[in-house]
Amino acid sequence: MFNEITKSVTWNGKVLELSTGKIARQADGSVTVKMGNSVLLCTAVVANTAKEGIGFFPLTINYREMAYAVGKIPGGFFKREGKASEREVLVSRLIDRPIRPLFHPAFVNETHVTCTVLSYDPETPVDILAIIGASAALALSPAPYLEIVAASKVGLINGEFVLNPTLELLKTSQLDLVVAGTTESVMMVESEAHLLSEAQMLEAVKFGFESFQPVVKIIKELAEEAKRPKLEMQDLYPSVLKNEIEQLFAKEIEQAFAIKSKQERSTSLDLISEKVITHFISNIENKKYNNYQIESALKSVESDILRKEILEKNKRIDGRSTMDIRQIACEVGLLPSAHGSALFTRGETQSLVSSTLGTSLDEQIVDNLEGEYKERFMLNYIFPPYSVNEAMPMKAPSRREVGHGKLAWRAINPILPNKVQFPYSIRVVAETTESNGSSSMATVCGSSLALMQTGIPIKAPVAGIAMGLVKEGKKFAVLSDILGDEDYFGDMDFKVAGTSEGITALQMDIKISGVDFKIMKVALEQARLGRLHILEQMNKVISKPNSELSKNAPSTTTIKIDKDKIRDIIGPGGKIIKEICETSGAKIDISDDGTVSVYAADRDKLKIASDKIKAIAIEPEIGEIFNGTVTKILDSGAFINYLGNKDGFVHISEISEERIDTVSSVIKQGDIVKVKLIGFDNKGKAKLTIKNADKDKSLNNPKPQNSINNAKENSEHVRCDSIKKRAWNEDNNAETAEFITERKYFN
């Protein structure tokens, strides 16, 4: 019944298996990918007719993760998979980027590729398997897919490159890099790095490129054995048409490209396009050339003119040389009510960035195949139509916006303080207010400025730059800080972000084959010089984080308690924690490991809540002195309430240095007295003394008052001080971290 074809290879100690002919046989191309316990179904479907006049290749990639792949039922009311998650969008783009440039330029048939995770194994990189499966499915389809793509993931652990590291290994890796390409060249790179050098990044790309070559081989073998026919393609346009356009309109196009303003240049080129179409209108009526052929030939002429100016004259559209960076302007603090804000402008590209601090309750909950976790750093990239002067409605975030936001997130994330150092959640929103090349890198620069203005203790300022490439034969030019037109007509989009010390993110998309590691090395070094120049301009405005947080930011602290004390803070039915929140106005979040995060609108409310928590959860030590309230008088002594909710007993012999006949002759119910903890009886009850404590000069000696509230305030204040002293004297990382946090941000 099935005519199944299977190819396999042992890859990094695991068997990678590709098979076709059993599942989804009616699809033009269908491949099942297996590695470990991961199983993916990748299909490709090609429309029978071309979509004439569309102006671009209508390729759609959909990556889907099914809940049953890990034995789960989806949450929500409908209990089924809904719209694509952020991860699904990002992996879809990861598949699209190395594949899209490899189709015949005249191919405009609707093409859909779907990659579905049927079974998930956390020990295998399913995003890499999806790229491999999509490439194999297209190789089996009738689409004119000109070269075979494969991919690999690279980590860096203890100075050694690791192929396809597991999720657990990635937690300790200095690098998370995906590289895809053919047998000849790299086509795509996506990475997050922890301040690695250009040489290390280049070696990582080489390592990944060499590692996936056996996979390219088995995809080719699978396609050759399946022997599926391919669509025959004609030239995109007749060469005679291009020659005629070049002869008639080349001078006008050159003059248009000499205009520095994007809007004026675009208007001039649009007018030329109308003239070209009008000139050939008679041929359109005779059906000699169609509109799409004319527009395609015109774009080719424009590309040739732009590229020739760069390669032969070292002259770019706006008059810059290949290494020049556009003029930069930076401003911070322009939004008074925001926690932090910045405006970063580079030429005609501009990003307005704001940063907001929140609590752990504001963290993004992410639920995917790996399980549920929280993300404390969120970065939203917004690209409104007005940024390119287009009259279009605002819509939900596009795939492009999600992808650009994630790239900026990767660039910023490595330089953020950890949660112990800075217990806030952070949201950055970057509005692209103008765009003419590399708005994602403007987002990186603006985000760094806004975070520093907010007072977030980032490790170092970060800047980003987009590089381009023009290559003809062996001659090439690498372009720094590319414009939109240079991106469109060029051969590479190469984005690098990092500090003065190293790279934090690298993204590369190549449109042609033959880009070797020599060119990549030149591009990386040129990007480093450009990045340092941009950082220099940014540092003139703000070079390090503000010492204090914005007055609009919430106050927060973190307290580490014993896990057994969690129930005491919560109380029966949440009574205690609710009372603390209501009386202090603070928010409290308790983790299972005993980490208590407290958030409040101001420092006073924060102190009230945190002191109450410490009073409940932290046990007093023998020898410590507290202010307490007399709650009951007996013949043998008195009960004292201290440290919030704790009670102890003072024997009559411990009340005064002198002999007394009755307790009530010295103290009365409601009095505030100074007590020292001297031990515990056999039932665990605290034994206190007044006579020794009264001589202690380390505390203020308040006059007795009949105020329980004042007694609690004084008691809590004393307790807080003693904790801080102990934090410095004991080898206790949690308490030390807590004290440093309070001292840095709230004292």
Swiss-Prot record:
EC assignment: 2.7.7.8
Disulphide bond pairs: none
Gene Ontology biological-process entries: mRNA catabolic process; RNA processing
Entries under InterPro entries matching the protein: ExoRNase_PH_dom1, ExoRNase_PH_dom2, ExoRNase_PH_dom2_sf, KH_dom, KH_dom_type_1, KH_dom_type_1_sf, NA-bd_OB-fold, PNPase
Ranges for region Disordered: 694-716
Subcellular location: Cytoplasm
Binding positions (Mg(2+)): 487, 493
Residues in KH domain copies: 554-613
Gene3D superfamilies recorded: GHMP Kinase, N-terminal domain, K Homology domain, type 1, Nucleic acid-binding proteins
Enzyme's top EC category: transferase
Keywords carried by this UniProt record: Cytoplasm, Magnesium, Metal-binding, Nucleotidyltransferase, RNA-binding, Transferase
Domain (S1 motif): residue spans on this chain: 623-691
Molecular functions (GO terms): 3'-5'-RNA exonuclease activity; magnesium ion binding; polyribonucleotide nucleotidyltransferase activity; RNA binding
Compositional bias segments (type: Polar residues): 699-712
Catalytic reactions of this protein: RNA(n+1) + phosphate = RNA(n) + a ribonucleoside 5'-diphosphate
Gene Ontology CC terms: cytosol
Principal cellular location given in the protein's record: cytoplasm
Superkingdom, natural source: Bacteria
Cofactor section: Mg(2+)
Similarity comment: family membership: Belongs to the polyribonucleotide nucleotidyltransferase family.
PANTHER family membership: POLYRIBONUCLEOTIDE NUCLEOTIDYLTRANSFERASE, POLYRIBONUCLEOTIDE NUCLEOTIDYLTRANSFERASE 1, MITOCHONDRIAL
NCBIfam families: polynuc_phos, PRK11824.1
Role: Involved in mRNA degradation. Catalyzes the phosphorolysis of single-stranded polyribonucleotides processively in the 3'- to 5'-direction.
Listed name of the protein: Polyribonucleotide nucleotidyltransferase
Native organism: Rickettsia canadensis (strain McKiel)
